[in-house]
Each structure stands twice: as structure tokens, then as C-alpha cells.
Amino acid sequence: MNSIQASEVKKICLACEAGAGSSLMVKNGLIKKAKKAGLDVEIVHAPATQIPSDSDIVVCHTGLSGAAKAAAPENTVIVQFTMFMNDPSLKKLISDLSEGNEIFSS
């Protein structure tokens, strides 16, 4: 299971399937929550098959986790969610980042 210390996270990629509205809502929600928590992290959006190689964490819907794992660099942390709004795993990610915790792949 991959992990990363919160202090090492510089870039989070929200992986999507087609770039439709739902994944953009998740990205914008993450940006808003990260800003509110005072986090200095870049949050980008990319197709699950084209994860930027400098991504420290990839956030994706469970249905895209296989494609995201295949496209992401080997040690990248993959955080999966099931609900596009108010998913507990996304809340935990922001909480772990702001508290300086170690973040694990889900």
C-alpha cells in the first residue's frame, strides 16, 4: 500500500473519465476545502489514463481506480471516492493534509 507524508504533497490530480461536470465539481470542492484549510497544494484535473507524472496523490471514483493505477507513477497514492458530493474519503484527505498525517492509498 502506497503512502506519503502530508508535508511532501505538492500536487493532487483528480482523475476523471470524460471531464464532465461531476469530476469538475469534485475538483472545485477540493480546491475550496484546501484553500479554507490553508493548504499550499496544486490540484489539477486529468483523464484517468493521462495522470501527470509529478502527481503525488491521485483522487478518483472507485470505477476509475484501475485506469488511474495503471497510468499513475508506481508509488503514487490513490485515494478513491464513491460519492461526488461530501464523500468521507475526500474529507479525510483534506483533514490528513491539514493535520500533517501520513496519507495512504485506499
Regions found by a protein language model. Give the residues of each.
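Short, conserved loop/helix-junction motifs that constitute active-site signature segments
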Residues: 71-73
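Fold-independent oxyanion-binding glycine-rich loops
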Residues: 17, 61-62, 81-82
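Conserved active-site segments centered on acidic
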Residues: 2-48
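Short glycine-rich, flexible loops that bind phosphorylated cofactors or substrates
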Residues: 21, 66-67
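Short, polar loop motifs at secondary-structure junctions
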Residues: 46-48, 62-66
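Short, hydrophobic beta-strand segments that form beta-sheet elements in well-ordered domains
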Residues: 43, 57-61
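Ser/Thr/Gly-rich flexible loops in soluble cytosolic domains mediating phosphotransfer, phosphorylation
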Residues: 12-14, 77-106
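Alpha-helix C-terminal capping/helix-to-coil transition sites in glycosyltransferase folds
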Residues: 53-54
